[in-house]
């Protein structure tokens, strides 16, 4: 939702302040295939295995989302 940095529905998430829906100090992310322990995983980490004609999808190191790298 607008103004939220993370999903504050789960107070157990150590990366997200459930009261404010903002990332805790020092956290880069709260969830995602490229987020681990509140930090973006390093560039080149495979986040989705190759399928058919598609190549492995790899994290960018700049986002918690796993991008579609394509062919």
Swiss-Prot record:
Expressed by the venom gland. Disulfide bonds join 6-21, 8-16, 15-38, 29-35, 34-59, 47-66. GO terms for cellular component: extracellular region; plasma membrane. Pfam families: Disintegrin. SMART domains: DISIN. Residues 1-71 form the Disintegrin domain. Keywords: Cell adhesion impairing toxin, Disulfide bond, Hemostasis impairing toxin, Platelet aggregation inhibiting toxin, Secreted, Toxin. It is found in: Secreted. GO terms for molecular function: toxin activity. A motif (Cell attachment site) lies at residues 51-53. PROSITE patterns: DISINTEGRIN_1 (PS00427), DISINTEGRIN_2 (PS50214). Belongs to the venom metalloproteinase (M12B) family. P-II subfamily. P-IId sub-subfamily. Homodimer. Suppress platelet aggregation induced by ADP, collagen, thrombin, and epinephrine (IC(50)=170-330 nM). Also dose-dependently inhibits the adhesion of human melanoma cells to fibrinogen but not to fibronectin. The disintegrin belongs to the dimeric disintegrin subfamily. This is Disintegrin ussuristatin-2.
